[in-house]
Amino acid sequence: NTAHHADFADRGHAHIYQEGIRIPPIRLYRAGELMNDVQELILLNCQVPRERLSDLRAQMAANRLGVERVRALCDKYGRDTVLAAGRALQDYAERKMRAGIASIPDGTYRFSDRFDNPEMDGDMEFSVAITVKGDEMHLHFDSPPQVRAGINMVFTALLSTVYYAAKTVVDPTIPPNSGLARPLTVTATEGTVLNCVHPAAVNGRIAPCQRVVDLIHGALAQAVPERVIAACSGVCASATFIGDDPGTGKLWVYLETIGGGSGARAGKDGLDGVHVHMTNTSNL
């Protein structure tokens, strides 16, 4: 699973080596036993390790609950039935995505937007060309070369954004699983802001993710305007606060993400002060 840990401090965002500790895929538990040396290495890089330890334990509790629920399903219905149901759900998501795409008129729909450039005065331009043909959709993105700032995004972040945004327009009732991705193809030039390569900084990638949703919505609004909401706040702002507790003298760290607002829908106004799109939304 994924969780936010507030105080892995960074020293800037010129490249990924400045963005705090990097942890490869490693086992925190092995055969149910805590690998204490791994945990200590992680906590040593925190300013408030007692809080981060609670975060880690919460993540592991969520994993254990997930394992228990899957085992309970297998015990009740049998492993083969559970696996078959999973495959059927993926196939169902694919069918719904294809049916939804087929309801959009064939054609190529283009849209571009601007994004603040952290390296120099002026803006960067992002653009998308969405080609709908039958029950398939291809999305191609153009953006400037990756920058020495944390707003670059790796290709997997672009993919998850595309899957979310396409689902919201094509058919919001599609189950969120890999089946919905089968009719979609995505391309973007390597080494650009929207498809960066090592050692690009990526800590603030949620900001361009939000703008990519705006791109997709802007393009598809030309074909099915009744299905697309107006542009939302277009960013995810966050602030980290740190200080000493006057009662205990202990250090504390607090991270808060700040919601902007959602755009109007076809028949309703938007909402104020809420998170939108690639923030607290159920993503793949």
Q: How would you label these PLM feature ranges?
A:
Residues N1-E136, D142-L284:
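Glycine/proline-enriched, intrinsically flexible loops and inter-domain linkers
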